[in-house]
């Protein structure tokens, strides 16, 4: 896991190295203070060979040098170190999020059907951000603390070996304590992160569906459901907090014993004349430079457990396999005719579930309008979703212009199929930007032209800022009919040879339906058009009507032929016209 993460770090290794070098200088400067104290006591105050004026002169020079180092030299070093560390870590997170976003766009509809959007967002935002601590702490601060400890110990050994050995007495207990607590903390951190993601997933769903909550007046019930998720997170968080508190209390106790031992031994040596008072004072100063980093290392280990848990979750997402892959030798094939042939297609969402489609065979000619009808759950929309490869067939094959759709590059295939759905998604951007999704390189004139053809231009011009009006999240500021017209406009802009209308007008009032049906009639002209519809009155003009029941095609023909047949279609039509 760490090795994989380091692949993102590798392009910035020289900056990290520079950050560590600058950090060594930054942390090395405070180590002069204990030596300054020793010099002031032993070299000046207790130096009876110097006169008072000489003592003041020597002390003034020493303090002047110290002030120059701490006031003039250290601040820019501190700035450079902080800037380098933050720039590098944020750039690495930028690369990770970029990779994750591209990965998410490549994942199939099956992944999104099986995972809460809120949890996915939590991994991309929260978990990636949490891994920043691995860069700042694991790759920078830990090394700086270790180097600080080594430098401090070297100076302490130089000052007095016995006192240094006394300081090292607690090290074995320190290492044992860290070892005991670290593994447990990592497990608890992973559990806490998962619980937080569940809270975020629940919250995301309920906020998106707040109209349902309010319409059924189930606020109290949903508050209880949220409280269950929130309470589970609280339980996990408190377990983590309790264990974290145990570790800090134990390790701080161990590191507090060290200075007490050193002061006791040092005082005895000073009384006996083995060391000077200045040496003892310097040693006490170095104790904080020794045990301070040791305490920070414990905090670093705690931080790293959280970072590793988040790293696990990030790579779980990165390792999510693609259901829909470009086949070997896939090409950006141009669809020239738009003929579709479906041979012996079977489909099931999961291996342990019953088939949704069973031995589907169908041919659709160039420019033909074909409608798919039947009871809900029969498999109409599922069949439609197989053509742009939102899902792959379980068995059988689908051909377009004689080419297996798996021979197309996925992006090339989908770019040549226009899809208008019942609830089209608009992004929280301007009207113009939402239309440009059809072809981002289109000109303003082309945007206006397709809006006119889609019967959208007039209502757009009545909006506060016209084409520059923000539509809100999912187009919340627009009516259903207005959103549908914008979605049709972007299909016009893309101008695909194949068009799929999946319940495109079923949720609209009669006036909106009439306006949109007019636009759809223009849109479907000279294109192979597939329509999924519940309102049979909207598809009587179709060249072919396909009736699907329980995953089987049970009837095929024109409206007149099927009415005359008095079968499944005639039964559905009669029910709707009672």
UniProtKB/Swiss-Prot annotation:
- The UniProt record lists the ABC transmembrane type-1 domain at 16-306
Q: Name one GO cellular component term.
A: plasma membrane
PROSITE patterns assigned to the protein according to its UniProt record, in alphabetical order: ABC_TM1F (PS50929), ABC_TRANSPORTER_1 (PS00211), ABC_TRANSPORTER_2 (PS50893)
Its primary localisation, in coarse terms, equals membrane
Q: What does this protein do?
A: May be involved in multidrug export. Transmembrane domains (TMD) form a pore in the cell membrane and the ATP-binding domain (NBD) is responsible for energy generation.
Its domain comment says: The ATP-binding domain (NBD) and the transmembrane domain (TMD) are fused.
Q: Which family does it belong to?
A: Belongs to the ABC transporter superfamily.
> Could you identify this protein by its name?
Putative multidrug export ATP-binding/permease protein SAB1799c
